[in-house]
Amino acid sequence: MGVKASQTGFVVLVLLQCCSAYKLVCYYTSWSQYREGDGSCFPDALDRFLCTHIIYSFANISNDHIDTWEWNDVTLYGMLNTLKNRNPNLKTLLSVGGWNFGSQRFSKIASNTQSRRTFIKSVPPFLRTHGFDGLDLAWLYPGRRDKQHFTTLIKEMKAEFIKEAQPGKKQLLLSAALSAGKVTIDSSYDIAKISQHLDFISIMTYDFHGAWRGTTGHHSPLFRGQEDASPDRFSNTDYAVGYMLRLGAPASKLVMGIPTFGRSFTLASSETGVGAPISGPGIPGRFTKEAGTLAYYEICDFLRGATVHRILGQQVPYATKGNQWVGYDDQESVKSKVQYLKDRQLAGAMVWALDLDDFQGSFCGQDLRFPLTNAIKDALAAT
């Protein structure tokens, strides 16, 4: 009786530990392999124990079938999934779509019954062949006419995964990356319906602000700024998460995005605060080479000799040096974000992207690989 009771208690404890654990969903981008020198990142550089889920971005769709994108994707798939040899609890997913894929191609497939069916049927064998545990849908973004088709695609994909798992296989996971912008949420997603069929939802709570605004501003604020104009009251993490929950997304399926990159601007005057006029995006980073975007490891370089400020109400930092301004996340701000998602009882955090963090541990002076992602992991584990 005593032994049985203690065994039962142990089982309950294990279940509680399992089911109360937060997800840490981390994206890896295949094009990071092409960055020069120390910016080049391959899947074998990733920490197999850092994240609960790693999502490989992106797969393509050719002739209505899921397909590789890069010439060496199959090799990189193998590198990634080898990480599970020493951490069998790690889950890997393959993300299909992305910015370069475009919305129109997704729309054409999802709106045609035969094309949609062909695509859906092609997914499980592809994932099984290459060792993935699931699929992530990154349709950026469904148009107003696509809203129902996106719901149907998700519903039918999930049904196929359930059917495919019948012979005793472990069921494939299905997730989606969704915009955090109110206008896109309203036009693109039937949140309550798609939530029923997704294992988790990654809400992209970043890129709220960019050079198109004509002024400086943080791209991933936790809260609304004190001086935000009317439309800007929606452009923050707190509003996006709350709105998703009000629309019917279960907190237990919502994974909150935290960026390991910053958005930069070139200042147009001597003003350097939030809302200062700009002449355009910031100068490209040495490795990422994209105007207006800096990887966290490039930001660590930028911070040498820069002036750092904190936007207290939004709980995020920005830095200025000369005519350059960059809003980013640091270890302090990600801890605030993790505490927020815990208070909201969300499923966990999502990171875009591992290859934009200091993955070598050589840029940020901490002798620590993936310092931002590790800070998120530690905060998730803290009681």
UniProtKB/Swiss-Prot annotation:
Binding site for chitin: E70, W71, G97, G98, W99, N100, Y141, M204, T205, Y206, D207, R263, W352
CDD domains linked to this entry: GH18_chitolectin_chitotriosidase (cd02872)
InterPro entries, alphabetized: Chitinase_II/V-like_cat, Chitinase_insertion_sf, Glyco_hydro18_cat, Glycoside_hydrolase_SF, Glycosyl_Hydrlase_18
Disease field: Asthma-related traits 7: Asthma-related traits include clinical symptoms of asthma, such as coughing, wheezing, dyspnea, bronchial hyperresponsiveness as assessed by methacholine challenge test, serum IgE levels, atopy and atopic dermatitis.
Assembly with partners or alone: Monomer.
Residues covered by the GH18 domain: 22-383
Organism expressing this protein natively: Homo sapiens
Cellular location(s): Secreted, Extracellular space; Cytoplasm; Cytoplasm, Perinuclear region; Endoplasmic reticulum
Post-translation changes: Glycosylated.
Keyword annotations of the record: Antimicrobial, Apoptosis, Asthma, Cytoplasm, Disulfide bond, Endoplasmic reticulum, Glycoprotein, Inflammatory response, Lectin, Schizophrenia, Secreted, Signal
One Pfam family it belongs to: Glyco_hydro_18
Any one of the GO BP annotations: carbohydrate metabolic process
Disulfide bridge partners, by residue number: C26-C51, C300-C364
Predominant subcellular localization, coarse grouping: secreted
UniProt-annotated stretches for the region Important for AKT1 activation and IL8 production: 324-338
Protein name: Chitinase-3-like protein 1
Signal peptide: 1-21
Protein's job: Carbohydrate-binding lectin with a preference for chitin. Has no chitinase activity. May play a role in tissue remodeling and in the capacity of cells to respond to and cope with changes in their environment. Plays a role in T-helper cell type 2 (Th2) inflammatory response and IL-13-induced inflammation, regulating allergen sensitization, inflammatory cell apoptosis, dendritic cell accumulation and M2 macrophage differentiation. Facilitates invasion of pathogenic enteric bacteria into colonic mucosa and lymphoid organs.
Family recorded in the similarity comment: Belongs to the glycosyl hydrolase 18 family.
Keyword Cell division: no
GO molecular function annotations of the record: carbohydrate binding; chitin binding; extracellular matrix structural constituent
Expressing tissues: Present in activated macrophages, articular chondrocytes, synovial cells as well as in liver. Very low or undetectable expression in non-inflammatory colon. Undetectable in muscle tissues, lung, pancreas, mononuclear cells, or fibroblasts.
Positions annotated as glycosylated: N60
Induction or repression: Up-regulated in colon under several inflammatory conditions. Down-regulated by hyperoxia in bronchial epithelial cells.
Tree of life domain: Eukaryota
